Amino acid sequence: MYEFKYHRPGTVRQAANLLAKNEDAKVIAGGHTLVPVMKQRLASPPHLVDLSHIEGLNEIEMKGRSLSIGATATHFEVANSAIVGEAIPALAELAGMIGDPAVRHRGTIGGSLANNDPTADYPAAVMALGATIVTNKRRLKPEEFFQGLFTTALEPDEIITKVLFPLAKKAAYVKFRNQASRYALVGVFVAKRPSDVRVAVTGAGSNGVFRLEAFEEALKKRFSHKVLDGLTVSPEGLNSDIHGSAEYRAHLIAVLARRAVEAATAKE
């Protein structure tokens, strides 16, 4: 690990100013993504701006008909929050599936979204629920925020402050995980919202999280796993690696989408 200067701002504004003044500075919260690559000397940011001590940035609360989760809320806090469990149980369940206890106690929702790992779980929930990513500068919809593998719309001095999740009538997340890393080989989040149905997939796309529009159209007519019978997913544009071929992932997506709908309807 190379030498760096550590900053511990007390407010989001102070953090943003530090990022603006220090070229190549990096934000850190839980550190589960950045610290390992720094140890391997694959990254050597001269400045680290730690958000974990900013008061209120991990707050979880209801705001009208939306669930607000602060950027530094850990996976453990999301998974075990009574507010999240009551408002969107599927989101609490998703957070409880992430990594192992050590990862869940340190990793944060904001860090996961900012990193935009193509196998991460939260992007599927954000996309399916139509959440809004709030930063110190603006509000972004999922389609604006996610811009490809490990790429987002965040500017160099822009910081995620919270995520606003609209409530869904029914929702569920199902994933087939890599047994070693527990990352999603394929993960499918299904959400029946007041106005529509959205089905989002993580872990499989060569360009990150994406939606299954054909499945959404079928489920709008009738929210039942039976309407998905006969629907398939094209392997075109899907990942193919040592963990599974594109064809295998395409099959998994269709299977998990049905299971997610079954899980969502079983909670009635």
Model-derived regions, located:
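C-terminal structural segment of proteins
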Residues: 1-268
